[in-house]
A protein has these predicted regions:
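The feature captures the beta-strand-to-loop junction immediately N-terminal to the Walker
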Residues: 33-35
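Helix-to-loop junction immediately C-terminal to a conserved catalytic motif
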Residues: 48
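Conserved ABC transporter NBD signature motif
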Residues: 56-68
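Conserved signature/switch motifs of ABC ATPase nucleotide-binding domains
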Residues: 123-126, 144, 176
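Helix N-cap at the start of a conserved alpha-helix in ABC-type nucleotide-binding domains
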Residues: 160-162
Length: 206
């Protein structure tokens, strides 16, 4: 279970997040919605360990959490253009988790099969559609065995017709027991996938 308690963040003395609190149970999906400037992506970056908080607590199962337990699927996917699909997925497990190449490739293949991307192992990012790049980015994040998977605007870079496909993929991952946190401005999508929704608004005070 992920708990965020009274999280605050300022940039240049301007409050971006103030006293944000929520609880996300294991296996649930939370969407965080709000307009641009509301601090949604900043909140995700703090939870993922990519940004520091000014105050507040982040706990997993009641204990201070390790950002290594959190995977992120970035809005523009951030795939390495010079690596093929399989290499993109296996790079971090071999370097960070010290998995053998064979083990990392076996796990990557399972993830690609799960995400219906088998047969594309040797392709490069430029050969993939936006939806396919997203699936590779998800597989890459899952290869690190995260407790929680975060998405930054998962529908924004895709054709609107693919929204239902993304919804199904997120629900399929939920069935496997994965806890998911989704930043989005797409209210319809947010309502369709969420067990719970957190609405954030821009803060006007300095």
């Amino acid at each position: 279970m992920l708990e965020v308690k009274n999280l605050c963040k300022k940039f240049n003395n301007r409050s971006i997040l103030k006293d944000i609190s929520f609880t996300l149970k294991d296996g649930e999906i939370m969407t965080i919605v709000g307009p641009s400037g509301a601090g949604k992506t900043t909140l995700l970056r703090i939870i993922a360990g990519l940004e520091t908080k000014d105050s507040g607590e982040i706990l997993i199962d009641g204990k201070p959490y390790d950002p290594g337990n959190v995977g992120v699927v970035f809005q523009d996917f951030n795939l390495f253009p010079n690596l093929n699909v399989l290499q993109n997925i296996t790079l971090a497990p071999t370097m960070v988790l010290k998995e053998s190449k064979a083990e990392a490739e076996q796990n990557a293949q399972k993830l690609l099969d799960q995400l219906q991307m088998n047969g594309r192992e040797k392709q490069y990012p430029y050969q993939l559609s936006g939806g396919q790049k997203q699936r590779v980015a998800i597989a890459r994040a899952l290869a690190m065995n995260p407790r929680i998977l975060c998405y930054d605007e998962p529908t924004s870079a895709l054709d609107p017709n693919l929204r239902k496909e993304v919804e199904k993929m997120i629900w399929d991952l939920k069935k496997s027991g994965l806890t998911q946190l989704i930043i989005t401005h797409d209210l319809t999508f947010a309502k369709n996938v969420a067990d719970q929704m957190l609405k954030v608004q821009p803060l006007s005070e300095a």
